[in-house]
Amino acid sequence: MKVCVIYDTKKGSTEMIANWMRESIERKAEVRMMHVTKVDSLKDCDLVVIGSPIYYERPLKSVLKFLEQRQNELKGKKVAVFVVCMAGIFGHAGKTYAEKRYVGALIKRVPGKIIGTAIIRGWIRKPDFSQKVVVQKWIKELLKNLEVKS
């Protein structure tokens, strides 16, 4: 199984989170981690994990553009999406808002089968290493679901 983790970042937190994902995946499967502007092909990816930080109430344009331009390659693929934002600090209401507004903006551009979504709490200055456990748990669940559904 080959997993491709694709991301963009502004200040580095989404890249760090993508690296945590890569570390978790490489224990169980082959993994490639790529910046959204450096993706060559998705042909050999069994699972595509795509993530974006949230700025000014939306995912980065580069990630949205990637999803729109890669429609044909994503058709028939299993896809998981994640966003990195501060909505989680607002409890259930913040999470519900983020699912609809941020995750929804990504999902509606994915022609493949969505097998998972995540809202990961970002940070302003110092990395929040407690989120590494959240990431590891999500990846473990994704891979388990992928094995069951394959």
Please report, for each region that a protein language model flagged, where it lies by residue.
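Short amphipathic alpha-helix with an adjacent loop that forms part of the alpha/beta core around
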Residues: K38-K43
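FMN-binding flavodoxin-like domain, especially the glycine-rich phosphate-binding loop
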Residues: M16, E23-R32, D44-L47, S52-S150
